[in-house]
């Protein structure tokens, strides 16, 4: 990394030949991590003469990641930063109250009808969220990220609300030669009219950023996670592979494999993929996921679920992004089958 930085600083002295935001356009894709974007940017401008604005931008991005020298510019970056924000919420929920399916529960020759007041309610919810995020840089390539988030969304149709809260902290550590070891902890709670669910995760992940071929930049990761639900705990293995392609398309693949948990419906494996490309100079995101959970038992009957999800999001105009998709769950117990459209409007947050 030091070699790249030195060559870049020498090249940046000659500003007569400008490359208009080359690094920004090619490397800082929406969704890409800062580390893979920085690696890409440094490689893109090796031996090239770039405009001062681009140099300042990359210098700032490097210093944000704890690379204290950056590109050698004198512009300081505070070791400790915090930000507060608020944002509106407008989305569709297929289960606003945490209720049950209106269909009868059929187990063999037995059939059970639920109480109508406990049926799930669906519809549009609107509300407000607020967050506090911070970063503390405590060493070369080492920093802590932390955040708190709370939100409330209400359904005017049903007179019901969904309250959520979450907290997270991450220790990010660049070891050497673009090897990283990170530790993450998070917890979240979702309160509805009928249900109140809490879960937490504690993980350690190692990753490597590299260039598998010319103008292709990747980050491979491997880690372990301990998942804490209210009724069980589970060990999980994590795999990830992210790439900025030569045509500036960004892709990400993640795989989670979980241990079997006796008499509990728990993740067996989950696979997700994301593709980000530019459409009319705006990021078009395509996302898909598949998960399989097994081990569940209900009155002596085994339960396993398969869930498919696909969505697309695109900025409609400044400060507003629309996301639409479809999710379906196929269960060995038909009562838990579900198919539903999904949509959400994501608004830019107001920082204060």
Residue ranges and their predicted role:
Residues 137-145, 174-183, 210-220, 245-253, ...:
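Repeated loop/turn-to-beta-strand initiation elements of outer-membrane beta-barrel proteins
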Residues 88-90, 126-136, 150-152, 167-173, ...:
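Residues on the lipid-exposed face of transmembrane beta-strands in outer-membrane beta-barrel proteins
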Residues 88-94, 136, 150-156, 185-191, ...:
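Transmembrane beta-strands of outer-membrane beta-barrel pores
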Residues 199-296:
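Detector for outer-membrane/organellar transmembrane beta-barrel domains
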Residues 321, 325, 336-352:
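Outer-membrane beta-barrel "beta-signal"
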Residues 26-168:
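Outer-membrane beta-barrel initiation region
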Residues 122-128, 159-165, 196-202, 231-237, ...:
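Residues that define the transmembrane beta-barrel architecture of outer-membrane proteins
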């Amino acid at each position: 990394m030091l070699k790249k930085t030195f060559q870049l600083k020498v090249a940046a002295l000659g500003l007569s030949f400008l490359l208009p935001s080359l690094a920004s356009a090619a490397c800082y894709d929406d969704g890409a991590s800062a580390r893979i974007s920085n690696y890409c940017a440094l490689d893109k401008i090796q031996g090239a003469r770039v405009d001062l604005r681009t140099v300042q931008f990359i210098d700032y991005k490097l210093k944000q990641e704890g690379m204290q020298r950056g590109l050698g510019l004198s512009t300081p970056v505070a070791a400790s930063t915090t930000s507060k924000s608020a944002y509106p919420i407008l989305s569709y929920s297929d289960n606003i109250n945490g209720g049950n399916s209106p269909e009868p529960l059929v187990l063999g020759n037995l059939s059970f009808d639920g109480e109508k007041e406990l049926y799930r309610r669906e519809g549009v919810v609107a509300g407000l969220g607020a967050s506090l995020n911070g970063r503390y840089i405590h060493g070369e390539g080492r920093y802590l990220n932390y955040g708190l988030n709370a939100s409330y969304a209400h359904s005017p149709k049903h007179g019901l609300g969904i309250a959520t809260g979450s907290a997270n902290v991450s220790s990010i550590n660049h070891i050497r030669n673009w090897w990283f070891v990170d530790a993450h902890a998070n917890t979240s709670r979702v309160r509805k009219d009928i249900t109140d669910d809490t879960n937490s995760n504690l993980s350690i992940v190692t990753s490597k950023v590299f260039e598998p071929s010319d103008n292709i930049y990747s980050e491979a990761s491997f880690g372990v996670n301990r998942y804490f639900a209210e009724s069980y705990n589970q060990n999980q293995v994590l795999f990830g592979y992210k790439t900025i392609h030569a045509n500036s398309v960004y892709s990400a693949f993640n795989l989670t494999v979980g241990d079997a948990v006796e008499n509990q419906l728990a993740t067996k494996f989950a696979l997700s993929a994301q593709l980000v490309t530019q459409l009319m100079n705006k990021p078009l995101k395509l996302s898909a996921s598949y998960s399989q959970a097994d081990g569940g038992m209900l009155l002596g009957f085994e339960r396993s679920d398969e869930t498919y999800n696909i969505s697309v999001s695109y900025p409609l105009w400044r400060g507003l992004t629309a996301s639409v998709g479809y999710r379906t769950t196929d269960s060995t117990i038909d009562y838990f089958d579900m198919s539903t459209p999904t949509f959400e409007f994501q608004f830019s947050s107001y920082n204060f």
